[in-house]
Structure formats: structure tokens, C-alpha cells
Amino acid sequence: MLNRRTFMTTAAAVGGAVALGRAAFAADGWQAKYPELVFGAIPAENGTGVADRYAPFMDYLSKELKTKVTLRIANDYAAVIEGQHAGNIHIAYYGPASFARALVTGVKTDAFAIDVNSDGSKGYYSVFYVLAKSPVQKIEDLKGKVLGLVDPNSTSGYNMPMFKLNSMSIDPDKFFSKTLVTGSHENALLALAQGTVDVAANWWNADDDSNLTRMLNKGMLKGANGAVLKKEDFRIILKSDLIINSPTAYLDDLPADAKAAISQAFLDAAKKAPEAFAKLSDGKNKPWEPITNKDYDKTVELIKFVDELNKKKA
């Protein structure tokens, strides 16, 4: 089974980059030192889904940068952090909290592009879902129930939920009968659909743009009886304050001209490779915009706050 120090690279994940890797890229400039760049992505969905979503974009990057770009999908959020720390992942797509964790733990990485929503905003929310048939109407009704979270390095699936519960004077260890860390946003909703958890934390941009809607569009959610679930089978009982959108970051020690080329390739992607760009977000996002590490200072504060909460409980 994959763990933090191992990654999977499937044929589908590499996509067009497999063929491109055999092509003769120009071996001058920074490409001579970096005949291959590795792009790492956090496991927001299952491996096959990520591979299919990113394959055309890896093809575009390989052509644009004139060097092979390979997609590697981590089994958990920490694997992306550790991959960049070890220098094995040159470009990484993070969640806000996992990026903040990378900075706090000393990873020399620089954010250069931020996701932009269809309405031009650059943030999203953490929500608590329950099944619509559940009698639960508010968080306080969940005493003694099972809470489903995502990953300790997830913003919307762990850190923000922990912050919100604390602001309501709720200690998850005492309030819930059990807290299940499911490993991904998809797994959290699958656990809710199957009745394994009574409430699940997840990300939400808008009514038509969330992990829930993506999974529903794929027919991935079925109840314990095997029936395919619909949007009306789920209900949000709590929504967080706005969270800054996810960044893409490259290693700080890459050559300056390599970083400039990578950044420009991302900023130009929506125009130069519209289909590949659209596939990344199911057509929901606008072109990337520049971002810096400084923009994630509040997220760094958030994870440090949650770290202190966990230390007090230990």
C-alpha cells in the first residue's frame, strides 16, 4: 500500500508525457539539468480521477517547458510535503493547509499560482454535510455521533473543522463517539453515504461547484442499500468562513529561468491549452493568477492554532 514516502505513477497519470518523454527535447539551458520535472498533486480524489484530470495538462506542460513533466499522485497530503522537502517533487499542487505545513516544516517552496473560481473569487469553504434524511439540524445535535474528517493536512477537511468546533466550545474527542480520518474528500463523502459516519467535512465553492457535485456527476455516491444518491439526499448544516484557494508551488532552488518558464506556462494555460485547463476543474475555474507565500500567512496561523489544540489533548 502506498504511504508517505512512496508515490504511484500510472500510465494514465503520465498521459501524454510518456510519449513526450521519448521525444527529443532541447537539451540546452535549464532543461539540460532537469530532463524531467515531477508534478505532485494532493489526493483530493481517487488516483484514477486525478490521473485522468491531469493527463492533458501534463502533456501541455511538457511541450511548453520543453522537458518531460511527470505526474505523481501522493497517497496522502504529507507525501507531497515530504516529496518537495526531499527535492523529488519539483512542482506541487497543495491545499492551503498542506502548503502552510510545508512552510512551517522548512520546505523551500514558493507559491506562484492560485486557483480562481468562476466568479473571480479566490476562496472556498469548509462545510459539514449530513444525509438529508438525518434528524440532525445543527452541530449540537451530533453529540455521540461519528464525525468524518479528511486528512490532518487538509484545510477544509480537518483544520478548519477543528477550528470551527473549538470556536463552538466543542471538543471532538469528548463530543463525538468517534472521529474517523478517511484520507480524502471523496472517502469522507463515501463514508457518509454508506452510513459509516453521521457527518462529514468537505470543500464547497458553490451549489454547483463542490466535491459533492463532482462525485454526484460521476455517479460515485450510493447509499447503504445500493441506491444512487442525488444532490437532494445531502444537506449542509454548517459553513466556515472563507478559506484562501489552493496554490501551486515550485522548489525555491530551481533555476530562475526554469521558475519563470513554469510560472508563465501556468498563467498562459487557459489560453494556450483551454481543453486541458478546463478539465482540471470541470470547467469551473478561471485562469490562474499570481500568488506569493505571504498570502498564506493566515493559514499558517490556522494550522499552528490547531497544532496547539492537539498538543493540549495529547
Give, region by region, the residue ranges found by the protein language model.
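A conserved helix-loop-strand patch within extracytoplasmic ligand-binding domains
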Residues: 115-170
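Pocket-lining segment of extracytoplasmic ligand-binding domains
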Residues: 146-148, 152-255
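An extracytoplasmic/periplasmic, membrane-proximal ligand-sensing/linker region
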Residues: 30-56, 62, 250-314
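Beta->alpha turn/N-cap motifs
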Residues: 74-77, 87-105, 114-115, 201-213, ...
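Hydrophobic residues within well-ordered alpha-helices
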Residues: 84-85, 142, 192-193
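Extracytoplasmic small-molecule ligand-binding "clamshell" domains
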Residues: 29-100
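Periplasmic-binding protein-like
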Residues: 41-42, 118-127, 218-254, 260-263, ...
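N-terminal export signals
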Residues: 6-26
